Amino acid sequence: MDTAVVYADLHLARTGEPKREPPPSLSPDTCQCPRWHRLALKLGCACLILLVLSVIGLGVLVLTLLQKPLIQNSPADVQENRTKTTDSPAKLKCPKDWHSHQDKCFHVSQTSITWKGSLADCGGKGATLLLVQDQEELRFLRNLTKRISSSFWIGLSYTLSDEKWKWINGSTLNSDALNITGDTEKDSCASVSQDKVLSESCDSDNIWICQKELKRESTCNDS
């Protein structure tokens, strides 16, 4: 009987003690949140850097494409272009002993003959007797012959049938542009001195000037 009482008291005493609750444990989510935040921040920064680099690369690519020609030259075209750049351009050239001025070549004779003789001589050279184009050309030719005392024949003569001065190409003289001094007879031809255009006999002897167009010659090197 006593033993049972003692056991009951002990049991009550133990069961009457307050229970100590274990400290609350942190959930796994609570511990991992800061790490996820850091990871997300790193990933965001990495993505931003990649985006910036992609934009820069795309800009460089677009700029490169804009600078390229739409049609690329073939190797044959490139070689042809190189050949053209190494060749000398075509230039205008007068024959030896001829003088160039604007688009003409002029040859001054060293002897004196009649007007018809000078006409024939120029024809033999593949040229024509001088046809004065304008006053500027006339000044050039006078300067070219200023050391020669004789006047020079030009391709202008008086035709009795028309009673007009005509050039050898058939055109009529414009008297406002060129004034002829001297008597006009049935056999009159025009010559030029340093200060006048003279009417004189076609059988007189004068030097003469032939003219021809400048000849275009290519100076490309053959290889």
Swiss-Prot record:
One of its GO terms (biological process) is regulation of natural killer cell mediated cytotoxicity. The chain crosses the membrane at residues 46-66. Receptor for CLEC2D/OCIL. Ligand-binding contributes to inhibition of cytotoxic natural killer (NK) cells. May mediate MHC class I-independent 'missing-self' recognition of allografts, tumor cells and virus-infected cells. Disulfide bonds join 122-210, 189-202. GO terms for molecular function: carbohydrate binding; identical protein binding; protein homodimerization activity; signaling receptor activity. The gene is Klrb1b. SMART domains: CLECT (SM00034). InterPro entries: C-type_lectin-like, C-type_lectin-like/link_sf, CTDL_fold, KLR_subfamily_B, NKR-like_CTLD. It holds the Pfam family Lectin_C. This is Killer cell lectin-like receptor subfamily B member 1B allele A. Residues 1-45 are cytoplasmic. It is a single-pass type II membrane protein. A motif (ITIM motif) lies at residues 5-10. A motif (LCK-binding motif) lies at residues 31-34.
